[in-house]
C-alpha cells in the first residue's frame, strides 16, 4: 500500500 493509505499523491 502507498504511504497515504489507499491513495497515491504526487503533488
Swiss-Prot record:
Disulfide bonds: none annotated. The modification Pyrrolidone carboxylic acid is found at residue 1. The keyword Cell division applies. Keywords: Cell cycle, Cell division, Growth factor, Mitosis, Pyrrolidone carboxylic acid. GO terms for biological process: cell division; G protein-coupled receptor internalization; neuropeptide signaling pathway; positive regulation of cell cycle process; positive regulation of membrane protein ectodomain proteolysis; positive regulation of neural precursor cell proliferation; protein localization to cell surface; receptor internalization. GO terms for cellular component: cytoplasm. GO terms for molecular function: growth factor activity; receptor ligand activity. The keyword Cell division applies. It comes from the Eukaryota. May interact with SORL1 (via N-terminal ectodomain); this interaction is impaired in the presence of SORL1 propeptide. Stimulates the proliferation of neural cells. This is Morphogenetic neuropeptide.
Amino acid at each position: 500500500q502507498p504511504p497515504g493509505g489507499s491513495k497515491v499523491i504526487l503533488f
